[in-house]
Regions:
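Short beta-strand segments
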Residues: 39-42, 181-182, 216-221
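A short beta-strand-loop structural module common to alpha/beta enzyme folds
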Residues: 33-47
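Extreme N-terminal starter segment of soluble prokaryotic enzymes
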Residues: 3-9
């Protein structure tokens, strides 16, 4: 039996920045492979904070996406996910399928390797149009410049409903606002923490001061008391 239309499933995971890149990848894939139906697998968001932030932050009426069902994910990967995957028989089945596909080299799951940065995964350019695919990665490095107008039309923030945020938005739009994000939290003391041994923020702000008249800095952080 053959399904009516081949499907490409893009995994949604991580915070809003990651989810934006994954959404952009899904739109790029839909443009490149119009014969496929591209869907988003948001099941990761059901069990991890902060959830499916993409639809919380942006206007749902502008976003263009279809959610993948468990059946879609099974089609694309050939293995069980979610609650079913925790059952003993499903674990055995999944292990056998993964092992067989690794041995034969015919996996339809593309896993972006991120150990050393975010390298381009060339296989993305040459997907077999007769197969279903599961795309798992972050895709920060992807060149989306050719489709920026499309993304800008779709990724439109939901209007503020609280008066204080609406007032702040009006204030920012009326000046040379510069947003500075200082990530602390899980980054503090880790290999990703650039604050102790770097002038990254100082140098960046100096460039802003040199090039922009009367900038207003809006600083945000997951630990604002430390960021200041």
């Amino acid at each position: 039996m053959r399904w009516a239309k081949t499907v490409i499933v893009v995994k949604i995971q991580g915070g809003l920045g990651n989810q934006i890149s994954q959404y952009a990848m899904s739109r790029w894939l839909q443009n490149k492979y119009p014969e496929h139906q591209v869907k988003l697998d948001a099941s990761w968001c059901d069990i991890h904070a902060p959830g499916f932030e993409l639809v919380q932050a942006f206007d749902k009426n502008r976003l263009q996406y279809l959610l993948a069902t468990p059946k879609d994910v099974f089609r694309a990967t050939g293995i069980f996910h979610g609650d079913t995957a925790n059952q003993v028989w499903a674990k055995v089945y999944n292990k056998l399928v993964r092992g067989g596909r690794k041995l034969l080299g015919n996996s339809t799951e593309i896993q972006q390797q991120v150990a050393s940065g975010y390298p381009v995964t060339q296989q993305i350019y040459h997907l077999d149009k007769e197969h279903d695919w599961y795309i798992n990665g972050f895709w920060h490095n992807w060149d989306y410049t050719s489709m920026l107008p499309q993304l800008q039309n779709e990724l439109v923030y939901t209007p503020w409903t609280e008066k204080k945020f609406a007032a702040l938005q009006s204030e920012i739009c009326g000046c040379n606002g510069v947003a500075v994000h200082i990530r602390l939290g899980d980054y503090s003391g880790s290999e990703h923490d650039i604050l102790p041994a770097s002038n990254y923020y100082k140098d960046a702000l100096q460039q802003v001061l040199d090039k922009l008249p009367k900038p207003v800095i809006y600083l945000f952080s997951d630990e604002p008391e430390k960021a200041f």
